[in-house]
Amino acid sequence: MVGEVLHPGSIGIVTVRGNQGVIGGMANGCATYAQNEEEFLDEVTKTLAGRAGVSLIYGVMDIQASADIEQADKLMDIWQCHFAGGGFVGIESGDNRMSEQRLSYNEAIKSAKLEELYRRAYKILHNNKYFLLAVQHGLLEHETLLNSDLAKIRESCI
């Protein structure tokens, strides 16, 4: 749902049907990689949205979202490498790149950015709660929603 809000029309299918041991999921409509830092951080935000949605609807933290958190953590490692997410402060010589100090610095930045993106996902869901609930209702009724179904639901919630 967050993906559809951030990039309308980008979600091809949403389902609650199981596949290869995973219950439910969604597929992006296009198979392109993030072209810039903003798009990349949108991907991390979408990854954290499931956990944020459970918190918003049920008022509890989703302790079963470990796979999502692990994926977000991996994406943040990529962000730090490819988009200089750790900044240039404290960069050490090549001989000392993996020092404890540098790793600790990077983990603190990554943790803060994950927290920021989680709050962003929560805010998007909160601001679009009627859309979220309508998608939830549609999935309960039909089990699978296509891009066209999401567009109709979104139109009805505006």
Each model region followed by its residue ranges:
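Soluble catalytic regions of large protease machineries
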Residues: 3-158
